[in-house]
């Protein structure tokens, strides 16, 4: 699953050397594994606990990723829209493969 998320991010021009790359992977992986919608701030707190950082740092790093994605896209997304769109796209592909 993690590899599919990384491949999708790289295909969108977001590379692993960016700080928020791993944060996005963790959040998307958690969303895909969950059977309910979770508030994005709760997910930021989860990642902050896992990575021993602050929620603000996680949000700022993800905002960097989203702004990089928005530069190459016609549609401008906010953090939560980007994360949930990515998660559902990958989940749809994952379910199709099974």
What are the residue ranges of the model-derived segments?
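Basic, alpha-helical nucleic-acid-binding regions used in initiation and control of genome expression
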Residues: 1-12, 18-22, 33-98
């Amino acid at each position: 699953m993690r590899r599919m998320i990384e491949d999708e991010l790289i295909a969108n021009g977001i590379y692993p050397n960016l700080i928020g790359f791993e944060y996005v992977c963790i959040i998307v992986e958690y969303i895909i594994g969950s059977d309910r919608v979770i508030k994005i701030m709760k997910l930021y707190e989860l990642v902050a606990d896992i990575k021993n950082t602050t929620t603000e740092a996680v949000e700022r790093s993800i905002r960097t990723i989203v702004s990089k994605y928005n530069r190459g896209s016609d549609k401008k997304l906010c953090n939560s829209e980007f994360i949930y769109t990515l998660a559902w796209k990958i989940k749809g592909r994952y379910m199709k493969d099974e």
